[in-house]
UniProtKB/Swiss-Prot annotation:
NCBIfam families: mutS1 (TIGR01070), PRK05399.1 (NF003810). This is DNA mismatch repair protein MutS. ATP binds at residues 607-614. Keywords: ATP-binding, DNA damage, DNA repair, DNA-binding, Nucleotide-binding. GO terms for molecular function: ATP binding; ATP-dependent DNA damage sensor activity; damaged DNA binding; mismatched DNA binding. InterPro entries: DNA_mismatch_repair_MutS, DNA_mismatch_repair_MutS-lik_N, DNA_mismatch_repair_MutS/MSH, DNA_mismatch_repair_MutS_C, DNA_mismatch_repair_MutS_clamp, DNA_mismatch_repair_MutS_core, DNA_mismatch_repair_MutS_N, DNA_mismatch_repair_MutS_sf. Belongs to the DNA mismatch repair MutS family. Gene3D superfamilies: 1.10.1420.10, DNA repair protein MutS, domain I, MutS, connector domain, P-loop containing nucleotide triphosphate hydrolases. It comes from Listeria monocytogenes serovar 1/2a (strain ATCC BAA-679 / EGD-e). One of its GO terms (biological process) is mismatch repair. One of its GO terms (cellular component) is cytosol.
Amino acid sequence: MTEYTPMIKQYLEIKDKYQDAFLFFRLGDFYEMFFEDALNASQILEITLTGREGGTKEKIPMCGVPYHSASGYIDTLIEKGYKVAICEQVEDPKTTKGMVKREVVQLISPGTVMDERGLKAKENNYIASLYCYEGKEYGFAYSDLSTGELKSTVIEASEDRLINELTTLSTRELIVSSSEKEVLSDVMKEQLGLTFSVHEEDTIPAENEKLVTRHMSLSEKRAIGKLLHYLKETQKRDLGHLQQAVHYETSNYMKMDYYSKRNLELAESIRGKGRQGTLLWLLDNTQTAMGGRMLKQWIDRPLIDRKKIIERQNDVSELMAHFFERLELVENLKNVYDLERLAGRVAYGNVNARDLIQLRNSLYQIPRIRATLLSMSSESLTELAEQLDPCEELTEKLEEAIMDSAPISIREGGIIKDGYNSQLDTYRDASRNGKTWIAELERKERELTGIKTLKVGFNRVFGYYIEVTRANTHLLPEGRYERKQTLTNAERYITPELKEKEKLILDAEEKSMELEYQLFSEVREMVKDYIERLQKLAKSVSEIDCLQSFADISEKNHFIRPTLSEDGSLHVKQGRHPVVEKVMGAQSYVANDCDLDENREILLITGPNMSGKSTYMRQVALTAICAQVGCFVPAEEAILPIFDQIFTRIGAADDLIAGQSTFMVEMLEARNAIVHATKDSLILFDEIGRGTATYDGMALAQAIIEYIHENVHAKTLFSTHYHELTDLEKELRGLQNIHVSAVEENGKVVFLHKIKEGPADKSYGIHVAELAELPKSLIERASRILEQLENDDKKIIIASVKQPEEVHEEVQLSMFPLEPEKKASSKETKLLKEIASMNIMQMTPMDAMNKLYELQSKIH
């Protein structure tokens, strides 16, 4: 058996309790890692891997980071989904015999980050927990530890529903029991990209019972208990800022699955995975970090409560009508700090003096914001104004205690104002008077010795000293100066008087700093009493910020207030895609109408690729979402229903992680919509059926349309390249053909991006191929094939190919063979056959480009 050194034994004992985390083991001024941790961390953090004697024949792998710069390395590990256990020395090495005691003081994981540098200002950092009740339902709870938010619900025991909740929240970490982790599929774990943490205890900690209400179900309470236990055990400190758990029902909000949100680019761009080009990016003119976070929550969960939607619309109208007051409101909001996260840091005990200055300055703005809102006539804005608590006593205390120029460090003084504490004033006077005495001493010593360059200085090692250059040391009187330090060109001395004064000054400064830290800690503790009030204030300010953002964006982008229909009808005049319009510019964007009602439930959209079908479909959905979050909408006029759900299938999205083809994903998403949609839902299907053979796809597309028409009655936009489906208008009363128009000018296609009634009269696939610069002979051949198809009832035509010798000459496969003198080469014939068999209308632009590249490579 290996006999390790006592220190390595201690390390291994602690590491055994934190197998799933990197253990940052404090040794002097460094956090060290050993064994497997060292091997992995050295690669991830790109730091030097060394070795240490530990009682074995070979050195133990080791790497480390300085404790004062460890936060950057910790952030890197957390960002990559790892956990870090911080192990500190909990005894003073100077007073301890033998091995210093060490303990893990905090486990930092992706869902428990509290350091500002590891958090994004306008994004929540959610950690969630799960409790499976008899395989029937999930108790689900989540919290943002940095803000104290705590919410819970019960959802169906379905992976799809769980994924929807987790992705809606952009959850960073999920706490499950070992048995629950086994049940969750590996595909789900990989797809979500979140950290899984196993924790078994799920009873509510005694000190947190007040956070749970009686009416909550058992599964909900167990999920909350699991979350609270995990936080308690990993954070090892007071979590007094956690708010009472709020129960929510997913049925109280518009539902959208993960794919729908991604396709519509609500909060994350498909291309760059950032906010740029999303609806959130467009609507976000919030001035505070907490307002930005609330806005994302609103967009993730649009309202279905008519009263609440109208209330927000009224507020936006009122703010738009008071331009100058809104400008004043914006200026005040700019000076409001992140009160939610400040409250969290106060509870954690890691708030500094600068934070308290920001808090005080934020509280200064509250009476001004309140007065501005009260000058308006909106009832709900007045109600919001009256909820604004300026915390006057706290403001006065902070004004009285904290210096405006206070440093970030809380242990070096310079924080507490003069006059706040008489004992502190006494120490400061002693220190200041002493320094005045030092300055006077320097003047007197120069006069006494005649050395004009003599100076009195100070450093932390030697304290106060008198410095004289080597050239002038002979001028010093003998017996009075005691040499303290020799430099290259000077000598440093002390005198009995200087030594005595030094003690008085340093004692006063040390006592002053100790007392300042004590006084600051008392102020910080006092702020804890206001955490709940500050959190309520933060919510009200965030809501005001979101509403002013809606007003500002609506005004700048010429949005109008929509009317909510009672009969489920949708009528949008000159509607626009808000994000595309912003990117292109209002002058370039082509607006379009959209009308849906009980007699016109399905719009079948035809038209060429690149013509704007997908953009049109998305703009209808985004208009509905804008309305249901309470914002105005991009149109000249809009009457909109309240949709309970939106389902989308737009774009080719092979699920590579899950190993599912485009067609399988199409069918799964189609099933999801068909099974769960109601008459109050909106369905957007873009080219359903293109992922399989032509007739299969056409048959499925027709069957899906008929099923929605006969059984679901949801408002539906269905785009297709199957022109044959346009005949359904004659059979299905609630289906209407529309198309995206295009014209030919000088043999070229011009896409007008304008929606018109009726089916498209022809396709423009060959023109698109021409734009892609396929060989001219190939384009001509495709045109002849198309002409023959159109004249011969659309039978599939295959170009003639060279027949095997045993096939008789009279067997003719082509209906229009090449002339003998122009017979194509074997290579050309194969290419022509391949092109003839392609169905360009079923291809996405990316598929087409890939195929063109493949064909060109064969030609060359």
